[in-house]
């Protein structure tokens, strides 16, 4: 295939001619369309040249007179000079035209899959592109030179971080607005929904769990309701266990004072060794079961009375 050298062009620009696409290198192959155009131009030039060398009308008329009307001394007759008719074969196939050649070349290009492999200047990347027809030349930088996988990944990561920061800022402002509205009672119809979230976060913070309101945004309302219901049940169960635990501590203090009164000095300090945490670990579930069987509910008044009585029993000798 004939190659046409062109001037040196920078590798970071894709060189394209109108209505055709070429590989971005220095040598360009002549396509079938260009070959058909050149053939048509050559045929037109040949026809013009042949038309220019045809004899003038005077020469043609004199030649006809000489052939049809010979001199008197010529032995030939007119009939002998008349040319015999030539038999021609008519071909129905239309002669090749420029438009037909273009259609044939386009169909051939559509059937063939042409791939042009472009090697970048630094031989770092190989780009495989399919030739396509474009109506406008472009100056887009070559992918083989500009495309950097690591750089694009870093840019995408930075963009994700920026989007997360924007989203977190928006959510924090919304949470602040919700908190102020609840605080001043401006949106009572939403107070219950947001109070559940705040109660969940407060319960998590009391137990040393790093949870924020933003973390609950991924949960649906049904999930928030189930979490809040579970926490409420656990809280009521814990209150019942605290009531039974306070009763046990008061009884242990009274028994300790009675044994000390009877002379058992070794029992001294028993009430200080038994704390609410130990009771909760050892017999916490049993305390909850006992409270449930006795029908002891979450009574704030009873819990406060038992708490005060526990403090006084530890300090005052009843017996």
Curated annotation (Swiss-Prot):
Compartment list: Host cytoplasm
Protein name: Protein OPG137
Entries under InterPro entries matching the protein: Poxvirus_A11
Source organism phylogeny: Viruses, Varidnaviria, Bamfordvirae, Nucleocytoviricota, Pokkesviricetes
Family assignment from sequence similarity: Belongs to the orthopoxvirus OPG137 family.
Induction remarks: Expressed in the late phase of the viral replicative cycle.
Pfam families referenced in this protein's UniProt entry, alphabetically: Pox_A11 (PF05061)
Oligomeric form and interacting partners: Homomultimer. Interacts with OPG160.
UniProt gene name: OPG137
């Amino acid at each position: 295939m004939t190659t046409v050298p062109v001037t040196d062009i920078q590798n970071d620009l894709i060189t394209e001619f109108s209505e055709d696409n070429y590989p971005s290198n220095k040598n360009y192959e002549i396509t079938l369309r260009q070959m058909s155009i050149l053939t048509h131009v050559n045929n037109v030039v040949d026809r013009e040249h042949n038309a220019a060398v045809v004899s003038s009308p005077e020469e043609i008329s004199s030649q006809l007179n000489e052939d049809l009307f010979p001199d008197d001394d010529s032995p030939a007759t007119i009939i002998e000079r008349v040319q015999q008719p030539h038999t021609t074969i008519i071909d129905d196939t239309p002669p090749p035209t420029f438009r037909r050649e273009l259609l044939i070349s386009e169909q051939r290009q559509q059937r063939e899959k042409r791939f042009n492999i472009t090697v970048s200047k630094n031989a770092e990347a190989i780009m495989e592109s399919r030739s396509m027809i474009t109506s406008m030349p472009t100056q887009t930088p070559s992918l083989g030179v500009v495309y950097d996988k690591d750089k694009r990944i870093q840019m995408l990561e930075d963009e994700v971080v920026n989007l997360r920061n924007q989203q977190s800022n928006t959510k924090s402002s919304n949470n602040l607005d919700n908190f102020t509205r609840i605080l001043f009672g401006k949106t009572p119809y939403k107070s219950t929904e947001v109070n559940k979230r705040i109660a969940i976060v407060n319960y998590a913070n009391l137990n040393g769990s790093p949870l924020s309101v933003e973390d609950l945004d991924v949960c649906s309302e049904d999930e928030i309701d189930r979490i809040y219901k579970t926490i409420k049940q656990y809280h009521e169960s814990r209150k019942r266990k605290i009531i039974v635990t306070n009763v046990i501590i008061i009884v242990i203090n009274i028994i300790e004072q009675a044994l000390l009164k009877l002379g058992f000095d070794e029992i001294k300090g028993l009430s200080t060794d038994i704390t609410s945490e130990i009771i909760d670990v050892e017999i916490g579930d049993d305390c909850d079961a006992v409270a449930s069987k006795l029908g002891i509910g979450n009574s704030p008044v009873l819990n406060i009375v038992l708490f005060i009585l526990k403090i006084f029993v530890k300090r005052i000798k009843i017996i």
